[in-house]
Amino acid sequence: MKIVIQRVKSASVSIDGVIKGKINQGFLLLVGVEDADSNFDLDYAVRKIAQMRIFSDEADKMNLSVQDIQGEILSISQFTLYAETKKGNRPSFSAAGKPDFAKAMYEKFNDSLAQIVPVKAGVFGADMQVELINDGPVTIILDTKEARKNA
């Protein structure tokens, strides 16, 4: 899994002008799945995201997790994170997970994360409009392939 984690003051997702999910302070996640992903990747990502300390404490040090601040998460499926750009000018997305598998993993990821932190989500495969107010900005890329290699 590749996940872009953005610390936000607020974020929302709309489809055809209708807001489908909206959060206040927390994380906006752009979530990509590849066919090699497994429950290991899913569990690793959920644990890392829930415990990642990138919110400021009273000393203005990044020391608090999304749980600590009672934040929320907006999760958006994003197959384009697996774009291959080495050849030509049009990206290939063949490295992205097959739609049925990716949808199941994305939904399981959201369900697992929602047991820890409130989660709102976009609609898998939909054309969505995402609005956010970055906080910092703080943006982190989590690639579970690295953890899988070391497991």
UniProtKB/Swiss-Prot annotation:
Pfam families: Tyr_Deacylase. GO terms for molecular function: D-tyrosyl-tRNA(Tyr) deacylase activity; Gly-tRNA(Ala) deacylase activity; Ser(Gly)-tRNA(Ala) hydrolase activity; tRNA binding. Its EC number is 3.1.1.96. One of its GO terms (biological process) is D-amino acid catabolic process. Its main location: cytoplasm. Gene3D superfamilies: D-tyrosyl-tRNA(Tyr) deacylase. NCBIfam families: D-aminoacyl-tRNA deacylase. This is D-aminoacyl-tRNA deacylase. It comes from Lactococcus lactis subsp. lactis (strain IL1403) (Streptococcus lactis). The lineage of its organism: Bacteria, Bacillati, Bacillota, Bacilli, Lactobacillales.
